[in-house]
Amino acid sequence: AQPLVLNYVKGTLGLAHNGNLINAPELRRELEYTGAIFQTTIDSEVIAYHIARERLNSKSVEEAVGRAMTKIKGAYSLVVMSPRKLIGARDPYGFKPLCIGKRDNAYFLSSETCALDTVGAEFVRDVLPGEIVTISPEKGIESDTTHVLKPAETARCIFEYIYFARPDSFIDGVSVYDCL
C-alpha cells in the first residue's frame, strides 16, 4: 500500500510511485543479497530501499533520488517526502505524468491537474521528463536534470489519456478531453 514510509539510519522518508519498473526483480535481489528485508512485493518498496541506500553516500535526499534513478528502469513518477522537503521525479522518457500545484504557501505534486482543482490549488507547471524537483520552505522549487541520461525522444503512455486520466485533466499541457 502507498504511501510507503521507511525509517532508516539517516531518518525517515515517505514515497508514493505511479508506474512500473522493468528491472524491479533484479534490483530487489541485489538489495536482498546485501541484507534488505522487504515487507511487501511492490515496486515502491524497491525504489524506497534504493533511495535510502543511496542516501548513505549522498549529501541530500534529492541527490539520492537522482542516483537511484540511474538504476531504476521503467515508466514512473515519484513523490518522496523527507521531514523538510517534498521531492518529485519523473522517468527520463516522461512516460508517467507529474505536475506541481500551489495554494497559498503550500505546494502539491500530482499525476493529474484535476487533483489540484479538487484541493483548490493552482497549476504551476509539469515536471519535465528526467527532472527532479525539490520543494522546501527555504528555497521554494528547485530543479535538477543533470543526473539522468536523456533519451533522444520522450514517450507517452496512450493509456494515460484513454483509460487512466480524467477528461478534465491536462498532461504535459495537453487537454485529456481534447485527445479523446
Model-inferred region functions:
Residues 1-129, 134-180:
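Conserved short alpha-helical segments that host acidic/polar catalytic motifs at enzyme active sites
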